[in-house]
């Protein structure tokens, strides 16, 4: 690849490429695995060379694709390097989401981890609350996207992915069905509850001002 790692367009290009890879990997005719590996190796190379100004993004990309390849421990190590270098707010938030996901996959589910998990889920819940816009409110109230598990709001999508694909199954494996059900219910209903509360407050405020 002859791309400039410091190009202003590189973030968008990487995001679009990863999204395309994800979509293709879920099809029966997927031929993208070689591309995944090439992109992973490129990301690691660029990050380790130290010439890119946005090394956090490259380490994050390498970590994400390494986990996609099934190597969670190496992915976690790469993500630690992403956490250690400077990045903008967007990439810091992306790193945090991936850290929650990797921790959920690799941690021993004991009291110490549950304390950390609670802090992480509170952080994610705050992102859900503070980034809601009218489009999200409308889609949530209509209910179709949630009912059919469609992706439409990044922060809530990540909460559902982490809980449904990793955390709840891990709790079920260790026989903690109550905690699995509690968290699954939270992930399934959290956004709707938030939107309903915000809508109720908005309506009361409007009536008060009339």
Indicate residue ranges for each PLM-predicted region.
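Extracytoplasmic/secretory-pathway proteins
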Residues: 1-210
């Amino acid at each position: 690849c002859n791309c400039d790692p410091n190009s202003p367009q590189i973030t968008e290009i990487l995001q679009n490429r990863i999204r395309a890879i994800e979509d293709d990997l879920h099809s029966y005719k997927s031929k993208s695995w070689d591309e995944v590996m090439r992109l992973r190796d490129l990301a690691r190379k660029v990050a380790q060379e130290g010439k890119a100004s946005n090394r956090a993004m490259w380490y994050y990309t390498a970590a994400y694709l390494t986990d996609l390849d099934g190597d969670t421990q190496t992915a976690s190590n790469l993500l630690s390097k992403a956490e250690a270098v400077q990045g903008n707010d967007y990439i810091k938030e992306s790193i945090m989401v991936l850290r929650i996901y990797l921790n959920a996959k690799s941690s021993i589910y004991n009291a110490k981890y549950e304390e950390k998990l609670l802090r992480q889920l509170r952080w994610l819940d705050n992102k859900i609350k503070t980034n809601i816009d009218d489009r999200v409110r409308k889609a949530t109230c209509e209910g179709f996207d949630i009912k059919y598990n469609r992706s439409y709001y990044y922060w809530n999508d990540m909460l559902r992915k982490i809980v449904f694909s990793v955390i709840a199954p891990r709790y079920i494996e260790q026989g903690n069905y109550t905690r699995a059900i509690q968290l699954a219910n939270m992930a399934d209903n959290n956004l709707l509850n938030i939107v309903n509360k915000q809508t109720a407050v908005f309506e009361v405020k409007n009536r008060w001002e009339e």
